[in-house]
Curated annotation (Swiss-Prot):
Role description: Bidirectionally degrades single-stranded DNA into large acid-insoluble oligonucleotides, which are then degraded further into small acid-soluble oligonucleotides.
E.C. number: 3.1.11.6
Gene Ontology cellular-component annotations: cytosol; exodeoxyribonuclease VII complex
This protein's encoding gene: xseB
Principal EC category: hydrolase
Cross-referenced InterPro entries: Exonuc_VII_S, Exonuc_VII_ssu_sf
Protein name: Exodeoxyribonuclease 7 small subunit
BP-aspect Gene Ontology terms: DNA catabolic process
Disulfide bond residue pairs: none
Signal peptide: none
GO molecular function annotation: exodeoxyribonuclease VII activity
């Protein structure tokens, strides 16, 4: 099973793609391929951020319940 790419690794690849797309000597086919790869990476990054946002929300909710229970004990 392949190791899951880190957010930072994917972001680095996206930055490389952006640099490639800014190259004036890039031909159309290479540009389209780079653009497609970039869009795929943006989607992966977006999904990763949404996943972490969901995890953070769950943790916050659990902690809020803990705090509410502690306040009620006093």
């Amino acid at each position: 099973m392949a190791k899951k790419e880190s957010y930072e690794d994917m972001l680095g690849k996206l930055q490389d793609i952006l640099s490639t797309l800014e190259d004036d000597n890039l031909n159309l086919e290479e540009g389209m391929k780079s653009y497609e790869d970039g869009v795929k990476l943006v989607n992966k990054l977006y999904k990763t951020l949404n996943s972490y946002e969901g995890k953070i929300s769950v943790i916050k909710e659990e902690k809020e319940v803990e705090f509410e229970n502690q306040d009620g004990d006093r």
